[in-house]
Every structure is written in C-alpha cells, then in structure tokens.
Swiss-Prot record:
SUPFAM superfamilies: Acetyl-CoA synthetase-like. It comes from Bacillus thuringiensis (strain Al Hakam). Belongs to the ATP-dependent AMP-binding enzyme family. MenE subfamily. Pfam families: AMP-binding, AMP-binding_C. This is 2-succinylbenzoate--CoA ligase. Its EC number is 6.2.1.26. One of its GO terms (molecular function) is o-succinylbenzoate-CoA ligase activity.
Length: 482
C-alpha cells in the first residue's frame, strides 16, 4: 500500500501542462499556469509565517483566489481549515479558536482580536520568501478540516487526510467514469466538502472545471447549453430552478450526469428529468465521508425512487440496530466504511471513539436496505433540517434561544418550505415578556441567516417524555397543523 504520492497539482502540471484547468467567467487557466499561481501564493504565505503542520483558516468565496490558497497551503504542508462564509462572526471565531489556527486568510472584511487576519490582497501585495514546497504528500497527513455540527449542536472539525481525498476522487471516477472531454460545472461552495472535492478531481483527473463564483441559476442554465459541461453537482432546489428555466426545451446530450445530493428528490422532479433525458444520479454522503459514499445511477431513477443507491466500489455499508447488523427492510442506523472515511474529529477523542468503531463510521442517520442492497435514507441524523442543501442542527439554534433571559425552554424542528425544502421553526416557553419579533431579531444577531427560525411559536410547556427528553415528533405535528 502506497504511503506517499507526488504533489498532485505539480504532477498534473507536469503531465498535461497546457490543458485547461479552470474557467471562471471569461478567464481560462491551464494546469501549468495554475501551478505557477499557487507557487507565488505559497511564497507570499511563507513570508507571513505559514509553516508545515500549522492550521490556517480560509474564509473566502468561490474564485481563483480561494483555489490558489487551498493548493498553496498543501504546497507548504499546512492544514486548510475551511470556514463557511454564511456563518456569523461569533460562529467563525469559535471554530477558529477550536481549530487552533495560526491565522486567517480571507477576501472579506473580518476582525479578530487574538488571530492574525490577512486579506488575500494584503498577502499578495507583500514580499515573497522562498518556500519549501512539498514534493510528496503523505496520504496519512491531514489536508483539510471542515466543521460539521453534531447532534449536541457543537460543531466538530472533521479531519480529512490526503488519502481520504484521493480515495473519494478514485471512488467517484470508478462510479461515473472519466472522459477526455469532461467538464464539471462547480457551483457548490468550496468550503463544503462537495465543492472542495471537485478541486481534488480537477487535478487528479486533469479535468476542466467551470467555476461559478456565486449560485446564479440563469448563468448555470446558459452554461449547460453553451460551455460543454458534462457533469454538474446540484441539490433539489437548484435542479428545480434549472427545470423552470428549461421549460419545454432540453439540455445537450453531452450533459451526462447531474449529481444530486442534499436529500432524496421528489418523484415528479425525477419524472420530469426522465422525460427530458436528463440523467440524475442521486447520492448520499457527508463531510465525514469526503463527499459521496453512495450513488444511485440514472438507470434506477424511477424504479428505485427515494433510494440513495449502493456504496462506491471501495466502500462498504450496512444497517445496524442495537449493535447488530439487520436484514433487508429493517430500519436501523446507517454505518459505512471506506478509505474516504475520516479517521476522526479534531480534539474530539470521545466523539471519535463514539462515532468510528473498527473503521466503521456510525452516521447517526436512519435508513434501510432493500433486497438488492439499495439504500433508503429515512432521516438525516433524525433531527437534521436540510435547507437549500445546507445542514441545520436544531440543538445549535436551541442553544442560542436558551441564552436569552426571557426564554425558559426552546425546541426547533423543520418546517416545509416551497423554496428551500425546509426552514427552521422554533417553539418557546417564555420566562418573561418577549415577542416573536424580538426572538427572531435575537437569533439574527447570533446565527447565520439560513439558520434563523422563520417562525417562533409560544407554548405553555414543551412536549417531553418521562425522562424529560424533548419529543420533537410532537413539535413536527404542531408544525403540520399550523
């Protein structure tokens, strides 16, 4: 088993130097040009003190700058801690402190007391210093840390190694295949593992990426028709937007795959795609699995509606209940294993031991397998709210609500929304005088916009069982009756 590999981008620039690597709007960059840009960023980062083994926070939007920073950190041998640009300042500061980063590189206005903050422009306008570029990557070494929320609501830093990212890209290629003319349209944020994984595929496959800086359905719709795109990653909301713009038309036959994540797609949506000849591949994955770990081929779009498919070639999946593997059609916890699965969480030994046992990742998600081994996901970590492809954990919102002096109890569940799929709804027991408007405003100051409840309802008491555990299913029933 290999322990090291040549520096990925440097090797790609050597093998196919003049092949187009990245397109952003009208700009085209070849692999050798990308390598040269990254070396320059690497030398500037070296001057500001970034060294091998250190953790550097990256708070940037999709763009050439973010791409070069991520690669430059790997050239130095530093770990990139990728931060969600939609989080509140308070949330970002907590994650940076937890990850023990030595500095933040950003393209946004941001101030932090205890952490040096460098704007990308500031870094690039400063002096250079000769950098010690990593000629080889150790597959066991951490490359990135991406935060994901747990059922406790406290975010956990998922450590993904070079080996994890390599295995993810290989598994995807064995699943979807590779073509010389492939072009993947990247519209997912690169601070999410789904977006980041495309950067890995880009340099490993030597595949052209058409990068969209910000989600723009009109631009994407046009690009699918005119830019030679063969693969695109989407969530249901994006797919719905594209079909609205497509109307009675169709996309070119060269579009061979729409990789759909973020939860099962409604059957009418899939039927429309079948009618229009759009091949939709439904997937199941998470940050801990370096992106997808299961995929449903377009061949089964309608015969296996609601299924997330079967595991990637080098991965395994089973359903457990009370620690025992159960037969088909019996519901239980989804447990997965593979070289793309994280080895654990940063500084969270207890959570790592609880979640990963003998190499098997206990996802906390509920599902079952049918008689042919197709996975059906019933609940994403049971309480998870998926809003426009973003994961929202009720416990984090409840923690914020309970920090208000006029809130005695709080419970949050998902509420169906035509635009986003789901949005948070809060139920509150008051300890003093407070209005719904005041509660929502309080949340706006503490949480990312997409996490702020769209409604706050007041109850005399929250439904609980004998152990005083909150009964979310009863709150969901109240939402349905509203």
């Amino acid at each position: 088993m290999m322990e090291t590999m040549p520096n990925w981008l440097k090797q790609r620039a050597f093998l196919t130097p003049d092949r187009t690597a990245i397109e952003i709007e009208e700009e085209k960059v070849t692999f050798v040009q990308l390598h040269e840009k990254v070396v320059s960023v690497c030398e500037h980062l070296t001057h500001v003190g970034v060294k091998r083994g250190q953790k550097v926070a990256v708070l940037m939007k999709n763009g050439m700058e973010m791409i070069t920073v991520i690669h430059a950190l790997s050239y130095v041998g530093a770990v990139a801690v990728l931060l969600n640009t939609r989080l509140s300042r308070e949330e970002l500061l907590w994650q940076m402190d937890d990850a023990e980063v030595i500095c933040l590189v950003t393209d946004q206005d941001f101030e932090a007391k205890d952490i040096p903050v460098y704007s990308f422009a500031e870094v690039m306008n400063g002096p250079k210093e000769e950098a010690s570029i990593q000629e080889e990557f150790s597959l066991r070494e951490a490359m990135t840390i991406i935060y994901t929320s747990g059922t406790t609501g406290k975010p956990k830093g998922v450590i993904l190694t070079y080996g994890n990212h390599w295995a993810s890209a290989v598994g995807s290629s064995l699943n979807l295949g590779l073509r010389d003319d492939d072009c993947w349209l990247a519209c997912m944020p690169m601070f999410h593992v789904g977006g980041l994984s495309l950067l890995m595929k880009n340099i490993m496959y030597g595949m052209r990426i058409l990068l969209v800086p910000k989600y723009d359905a009109d631009f994407i719709h046009k690009a699918l028709q005119t830019r030679g795109v063969t693969i695109i990653s989407v969530v249901s909301k994006m797919l719905t937007d594209l079909l609205e713009r497509l109307g009675e038309g169709t996309y070119p036959s060269s579009l061979r795959c729409m990789l759909l994540g973020g939860g099962p797609a409604p059957k009418p949506l899939l039927e429309t795609c079948v009618d229009k000849g759009i091949p939709v591949y439904q997937t199941y994955g998470m940050t801990e699995t370096s992106s997808q770990i299961c995929t449903l081929s377009a061949d089964y779009m309608l015969t296996k509606v609601g299924s997330a498919g079967k595991p990637l070639f080098q991965c395994q999946l089973r359903i457990e209940k009370d620690g025992v593997v159960v037969p088909p059609f019996v519901e239980g916890e989804i447990v997965v294993k593979g070289p793309n699965v994280t080895g654990g969480y940063f500084n969270r030994e207890d959570a790592t031991r609880e979640t990963i046992q003998n190499g098997w990742l206990h996802t906390g998600d509920l599902g079952y397998l049918d008689e042919e081994g197709f996975l059906y996901v019933l609940d994403r970590r049971s309480d998870l709210i998926i809003s426009g492809g973003e994961n929202i954990y009720p416990a984090q919102i409840e923690e914020v609500l309970l920090s208000h002096p006029m809130v005695a109890e709080a419970g949050v569940v998902g509420m169906t929304d035509d635009k986003w799929g789901q949005v948070p709804a809060a139920f509150v027991v008051k300890s003093g005088e407070i209005t719904e408007e005041e509660i929502l405003h309080f949340c706006e100051e503490k949480l990312a916009k997409y996490k702020v409840p769209k409604k706050a309802c007041f109850l005399e008491e929250l439904p609980r069982n004998a152990s005083k555990k909150l009964l979310r299913r009863e709150l969901r029933q109240l939402v349905e009756e509203m």
